[in-house]
Amino acid sequence: MAGVSCTIETDKLPPNLRGICQRRESRAADSEDLNVTKRNIGVLGAGTWGMALARMLCVSGNDVQVWSAIEKEIDSLSSTRVHPNLPGMKIPDELRFTKSIEEACKDKDVLLFAVPSVFVRSTAAKARPYVADDQIIVDVAKGIEPDTLYTMTEILADELGKEGG
């Protein structure tokens, strides 16, 4: 995926993010020159955090596919290529969307869980049949499950039968 191009309309971003995004863009362009392993990544969750991470992973040259439990959200993101809470961030054409959690999980090197903490367990349960033993699992949600006092990593280990680190 060398040569992935995308733009951020930095004038539409909050002032504190403008410089960060410009630096990130220049680093992403430089990543083609590095000896970096490109990954096939499934992102579970299309909220603000999930989409920001998906975009960053995509412009870094990875093959990224995003899933959401909200089908209308996938339709909107696919057609507009803009997240409603991130109006200055254009979604690269190379970033793909799916309504199928199976498609988002299968044949991926990495699964990135980017759903709110209250949905980590239910999302992991939906993903469980499609998670391979050799997949890298990453969770970016924070919090503690009230009933069990488990962290999000412990919930994923419980649901997926994989120990995290």
What do the predicted segments below correspond to?
Residues 11, 16, 30-33:
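Intrinsic-disorder-associated, low-complexity terminal segments enriched in Asp/Asn/His/Tyr and depleted
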Residues 19, 33-90, 96-99, 126:
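NAD(P)+-binding Rossmann beta1-loop-alpha1 motif at the extreme N-terminus of oxidoreductases
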Residues 101, 110-165:
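Rossmann-like NAD(P)(H) cofactor-binding subdomain of soluble oxidoreductases
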Residues 104-106:
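A short, aliphatic-rich alpha-helical micro-motif
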